[in-house]
Amino acid sequence: MSEMTPPQIVSELNKFIIGQEQAKKAVAIALRNRWRRMQLNNELRHEITPKNILMIGPTGVGKTEIARRLAKLANSPFIKVEATKFTEVGYVGKEVDSIIRDLTDAAIKMIRVKNIEKNKLRVEEIVEERILDVLVPRPKNNWTENEKNESLLNTLQVFRKKLREGILDEKEIEINVLASTMGVEIMAPPGMEELTSQLQSLFQNLGGHKKNTRRLKIKDAVLLLKEEEAAKLINQEEIKKEAINAVEQNGIVFVDEIDKICKRRDSSGPDVSREGVQRDLLPLVEGCTVSTKYGMVKTDHILFIASGAFQTSTPSDLIPELQGRLPIKVELQPLTINDFEKILTEPTASITAQYKALMKTEGVCINFTKEGIRNIAEAAWKVNESMENIGARRLHTILEKLMEDISFNACDNVGKTIEINSEYVGKHLDQLISNEDLGRFIL
């Protein structure tokens, strides 16, 4: 778990997200409180539950990105789900319990990767020896012991050096590897994912541990053997135990579009896709135990971050019990021209930096001037104001249109420097922005 202080967390988020200081502050405190909780004794630790967060703001202002970056900083199991994908229990559709199952799957994958990385050097040594055993067969017994040892060691050293330098990558060898398990695709109705997963695991285990002899290039054999040897060094039970603990103590669930499951004020009668889903979500957020194929998972200390635009509803339209379980409410502000300008240049791997890097692979140098950046920001803001406001995502649409000709004719401009200035932006965008009907389809 991250031991970063709230100011450090906000500083790290600032590298990727512009503005929204209030939201960053709220998630930074929530993350730090997790670390604080882990420092307490067991009795008190169990009593302290996370303060879940509700982010309110239009699309494209950074709600999802804040949650995603937070999970990376915390090195925690993280999953993003759309509230609209779920239906009330008893109806056709995904049940909310699958959120925790998917989160546990993500944790298993995360812990497995961590374990493989930890054993990386050991695996490389084992694989190297297995390849050398094939390349340098053991000599016959009619050699004297001294001659055998000296000659074998010299030969091994020569082949080891060649192997490490990649000289033998294209050479083909025959190796014994575990037979691949039979691929069984099982179709199941929505909500039956758990049963499907168990049946697939059952069929995969039927193959046992049979070995096949395969003829492969050394570079391909190395990859295959690394997977095989890494799997041998991994303790599956330990991974399950560690993953379940990671989910229960550090898991983060981001529920997007929660406003879409609010019951409309003017509607009456049961609504499968709205209030019923909220009531099914409630036990997860309050704390319950969910059965997964890896074991039982308690949700008491999982952090839930919900978000929605709430354009046709308000947070008070959520059922009261769910409102109470999302005590921290943060409003994210619409993006201004200055925000767009900063988004284009300031974040790590900003959009303009990405385009520069892509064009550099073709030998084309792109230079965005300060005036050009300002014009792009103004164009994005104007289009958002006159049409649908999609926030920072509008910049991708605008830049893609700006770079269209450059990308298409990149091969003809090798070695050239192209300047994206005020004149260039005006030439390519002014007509589209002024003609609202045309812009609606293109931008």
Swiss-Prot record:
Superkingdom, natural source: Bacteria
Source organism of the structure: Buchnera aphidicola subsp. Schizaphis graminum (strain Sg)
Protein name: ATP-dependent protease ATPase subunit HslU
Subunit structure: A double ring-shaped homohexamer of HslV is capped on each side by a ring-shaped HslU homohexamer. The assembly of the HslU/HslV complex is dependent on binding of ATP.
Gene: hslU
Gene Ontology cellular-component annotations: HslUV protease complex
Gene Ontology BP annotations: protein unfolding; proteolysis involved in protein catabolic process
UniProt-listed Pfam families: AAA, AAA_2
Sorted UniProt keywords: ATP-binding, Chaperone, Cytoplasm, Nucleotide-binding
CDD domains with a match to the protein in the record: RecA-like_HslU
Family to which the UniProt record says this protein belongs: Belongs to the ClpX chaperone family. HslU subfamily.
Upper lineage: Bacteria, Pseudomonadati, Pseudomonadota, Gammaproteobacteria, Enterobacterales
